[in-house]
């Protein structure tokens, strides 16, 4: 494994660990792994290419909009999700490269 494939700092690793240290956030990552299987079709935005509308994620989780927003922001700030604004809505999709990189780092650390 080359060094550039690993996360650069302990702070970066801790930020990601904190982001995934929640059952709800782990559920979000799991649901977004199969967006077409877990969410209904959207009028604006392709579920795979553009991501899933935050409102559909909130509905799937059965939580308040503010709570969903906080969870999605933590995952996005940690680099595990991409957020895309489109026609007044925010769509989220997984950052597969960052997830793989974190998994490699975790395996290396432990």
Can you say where each PLM-predicted feature lies in the sequence?
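A common structural junction motif
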Residues: 109-110
């Amino acid at each position: 494994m080359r060094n550039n494939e690993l996360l650069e700092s302990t702070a970066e690793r801790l930020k990601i660990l904190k982001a995934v240290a929640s059952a709800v956030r782990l559920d979000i990552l799991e649901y977004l792994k199969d967006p077409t299987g877990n969410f209904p079709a959207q009028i604006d935005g392709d579920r795979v290419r553009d991501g899933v509308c935050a409102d559909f994620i909130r509905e799937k989780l059965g939580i308040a909009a503010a709570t969903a927003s906080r969870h999605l922001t933590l995952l996005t700030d940690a680099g595990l999700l991409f957020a895309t604004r489109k026609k007044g809505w925010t769509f989220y999709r997984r950052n597969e490269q960052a997830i793989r990189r974190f998994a490699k780092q975790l395996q290396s650390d432990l």
